[in-house]
A protein has these predicted regions:
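Oxidoreductase cofactor-interface core, primarily capturing Rossmann-like NAD(P)-dependent enzymes
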Residues: 2-31, 35-38, 45, 58, ...
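General small-molecule cofactor/ligand-binding pocket signal
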Residues: 33, 49-51, 134, 240-245
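NAD(P)H-binding glycine-rich loop region in Rossmannoid oxidoreductase-like domains
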Residues: 36-93, 97, 101-109
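A short acidic, often aromatic-flanked loop/helix-cap motif at beta-alpha or helix-coil junctions
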Residues: 56-62, 141-144, 247-254
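Amphipathic alpha-helical segments that line or abut small-molecule/effector binding pockets
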Residues: 85, 196-204, 301, 305
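Terminal hydrophobic/aromatic helix or amphipathic segment near a protein terminus
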Residues: 215, 220, 224-282
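Amphipathic terminal alpha-helices
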Residues: 286-312
């Protein structure tokens, strides 16, 4: 049975947060409040209820969470930890942390892209007797391959690897560093999902009476080799350069970047190594795909052709 008229808080105003907010507003009867560190006059003008939150002030967070049943977070680091603490104190029933990528258990301990995610999951585990939580797993967002990068969708602003061409392929200049092999020298695979489809699945999950600890969704699963070939075919141009990589070589490059103190290169290499090691791959169909067969995700080729249509 759908959960009726819940009060749902979305923390953050990135592109994914706003897609989820739009989906809630248009297709559910839930009450929505968007939490932001700055005043959102534009969103308020569009009819959204917004609350300005100071994450350094517990009473500010408590006030914003009054009567909230479920929190969906897209904020990371210390603000998210404070949000979790406040959610527990305000007796919020459910909390979805800012994950929206691969399986956390496969992440490196010292992942440069962690952004406090490990600490957030540990805190939710600590409070598991008081608040329900889930990790939304969607693999790689299509928007990583977008014209002007996923930063143009206001996604991944804290990752340091959200620019055009930062991940696997630069489709404008037709260059690629492709992590096509896994540790066994087999072809590596990954799952990908559009941000719009992630929003659809997340909003459907609001109506589930109990959340599983992890809930996966996907738009498409393919080998990295198939992905770069698909991008080449969509662009109808040959690669000017393409490097086929395996985990050992990527780890060597990453170690060299660490020794040189080259943080920018580390941030670009870390997701490639994670891809080669299968961190963005999981069993399909996804859990939420199975529960919502009426949602037909956009295929990567369809999304890519539309996104790059205006670029020669």
């Amino acid at each position: 049975m759908p959960e009726l008229n819940m009060r749902v808080a979305i923390a953050g105003t990135c592109g994914l947060a706003l897609l989820i907010a739009k989906e809630i507003n248009e297709y559910t009867s839930h009450q929505l409040i968007i939490l932001s560190r700055s005043q959102q006059t534009g969103l308020i003008a569009q009819g959204y209820e917004c609350a300005t939150v100071d994450y350094n002030n517990p009473s500010s967070i408590h006030h914003a969470l009054m009567g909230v049943d479920t929190v969906i977070s897209t904020v990371s680091g210390t603000p998210q930890l404070r949000l979790i603490e406040a959610a527990v104190q305000c007796r919020v029933r459910r909390f979805a942390p800012a994950e929206f990528e691969g399986q956390p258990r496969l992440r490196e301990q010292n992942d440069i892209l962690d952004c406090g995610k490990r600490s957030a999951l540990a805190l939710l585990q600590h409070y598991r007797g008081y608040i329900q939580s889930t990790i939304f797993i969607c693999g790689i967002l299509y928007e990583r391959f977008s014209v002007n990068g996923m930063l143009s969708h206001r996604i991944g602003t804290s990752t340091g690897c959200g620019n055009e061409g930062d991940y696997i392929a630069n489709a404008r200049y037709m260059t690629s560093m492709a992590p096509v092999y896994d540790t066994q020298q087999n072809l590596s695979c990954l799952c990908l999902t559009s941000a719009y489809d992630v929003a659809q699945f997340v909003v459907r999950a609001l109506d589930m009476p109990i959340w599983a600890p992890e809930m996966s969704m996907y738009g498409e699963r393919m080998t990295v080799n198939s992905l770069v070939e698909l991008i080449r075919a969509c662009r109808n141009r040959p690669w000017t350069s393409i490097e086929y990589q395996d985990p050992a070589n990527l780890q060597y490059k990453l170690t060299m970047a660490q020794m040189a103190g080259d943080t920018a290169t580390q941030r670009r290499l870390a997701p490639l190594l994670a891809t080669a090691e299968g961190c963005y791959d999981f069993a399909v169909p996804g859990f939420l795909n199975q529960l919502n067969p009426d949602i037909v995700p956009t295929r990567f080729q369809t999304w890519f052709l539309q996104n790059w249509a205006s670029i020669p």
